[in-house]
């Protein structure tokens, strides 16, 4: 039996075995003090996963406290499986985003698939039916064979899981930069709907109540996954494939239906997903949140491998498992319910009053630790922070407009940059129409899903321009939230709240910690100004390979409320003769832009700037015009500037083009990436009414010529481009790079 091989408490201390599990000398001394004795092997394992950055946020908590987390509509902020926001009529939207970066770097298909599975469980553990999935992906340059492999496998993994489980993947974003070559980012978001009375918490109340294990059996996959996610990737990480879990979407589909039926039963007290740190986190957190303890008999854990030790069972991150607490005496009802779905439901313990997590195996007590010590009392570190050396240098640079010889060729080249190019190759692999509630499919500013039985819809998006955040973390943090809100507004939605996924390098490096602090400062300010509180999220640190960190990438997932589906607006032009308006001024801002990266092969200088009060004013005006029925199409101006935004609106339409006139220096007018700008089209008869509501400049009109023609203020033609040719270049870019 492998039990014989476990080191004893003295060996764990003297041979510093705890260090291999991720605990520091000081942390091990704290554990010894909490217990009043040396921990055994299982107990050391419990502390090592629960005190990892991934589970405890020990390095990021002081920064996360800056986020605004309350608001009129917020029913549940950070701290539970997912956040919840009221949408009226006794309904609420539940959503959360999480990362699965490290597993996806090692085993991309399963890493991405189980990332999707985990975030779905977070949402239905709150009592909500999952209705949509989104993702935000980062990879190196597609010229590299390894990157092509990671990209193809990650997309296949997301598709494989989401399509089988029957939840539409409706939106997302993909960006490519060399810094992600060895460390891709895979962030998955799930959105669910719930009635107020069905909201459930992951809390173990009521001494004597029964603790039950439901779902798939436990294997050795994913042991120490949380610890693995709290260290840098290296050559030896390849050997950690066992730390990557394997998902079964068909099992999860059954689990969703069983749990949603269970939630209607008054026998249920609390429910939580076994996510990172598996049984350890679910039991310790449920006990701690309720101010109770839990006693568990590990012989009763359904196991799919023989001879598993308590340590292995507690730390396994096998997928498709939930821990539930039910009223004493009602266990058989639960067993019967799960049996109907061919799922196991096993009694394995009870709730106690003494606040201890106590584990038994083969008649012996194998662990006894305070639940609060695991769930709440991890040390909190105030890491040293130091402004990155490059920042002052970039801020002092005198920025020059990139030299462009041929505007048309430059536009075509930009449309073929993988970050701008059509992502159809990606989303064509996703079933985005399953459940038949998708109103706006992938490819527009935000996806929209109808709320059945009402006239309402939910708009949703993921956004983050990591280049801006690298150049100026605080300004970039503001832009990430503002762009997400702009996308929601362009779709006809009122921004409600955000979930975030903070992807950074090693927080022990002062310059990385400075990036974390500053970007959170920027995001927090934007959330306050735009009234979109943070209702939950995830931190992913140590995204480095060979000491090189990824760009700071605090991804924003935002959900908005479309009050009436009549207001749903998309980015493509609708009919010839409509007037084209631009909202917002264009400045020669090229730092971190697609044009700068394309011409110079790198990014430098100052990021675009943003005034949040101006942003809010413009968003409110655009939303008011949309809700008044005055807007035909709306598109946010982002990567590639106005020329790309206008071209995208033409590409999305059939047989339409536009003739527009842009003032100012030509390269900036066409390609600068100034913030808070929109391209809007309006019916001619609504011109006056629209101009009363929105401060905008009419720049041209939609034509039936199938060409985009852009003039300068002297009326000289800067470029004329055939829309079919642009569409072909834009759609063909990613498939061509993958050949």
Swiss-Prot record:
Residues in the active site? 54, 100 (proton acceptor)
> Which residues does the annotation say bind Mg(2+) 2?
122, 273
Q: Which domain of life is it from?
A: Bacteria
> Alphabetically, which GO biological process terms does the record hold?
'de novo' IMP biosynthetic process; purine nucleotide biosynthetic process
Residues given in the record as Mg(2+) 1 binding sites: 98, 538
Signal peptide (from-to): none
Keywords from the UniProt entry: ATP-binding, Cytoplasm, Ligase, Magnesium, Metal-binding, Nucleotide-binding, Purine biosynthesis
In which residues is ATP bound?
57, 96, 500, 537
Instruction: Identify which top EC class this enzyme belongs to.
Output: ligase
**Known catalysed reaction(s)?**
N(2)-formyl-N(1)-(5-phospho-beta-D-ribosyl)glycinamide + L-glutamine + ATP + H2O = 2-formamido-N(1)-(5-O-phospho-beta-D-ribosyl)acetamidine + L-glutamate + ADP + phosphate + H(+)
Q: Which SUPFAM superfamilies match?
A: PurM C-terminal domain-like, PurM N-terminal domain-like
Report the subcellular localization: Cytoplasm
Oligomeric state and interaction partners are given as: Monomer. Part of the FGAM synthase complex composed of 1 PurL, 1 PurQ and 2 PurS subunits.
Q: What is this protein called?
A: Phosphoribosylformylglycinamidine synthase subunit PurL
Native source species: Bacillus cereus (strain ATCC 14579 / DSM 31 / CCUG 7414 / JCM 2152 / NBRC 15305 / NCIMB 9373 / NCTC 2599 / NRRL B-3711)
Organism lineage string: Bacteria, Bacillati, Bacillota, Bacilli, Bacillales
As recorded in Swiss-Prot or TrEMBL, the protein's gene is named purL
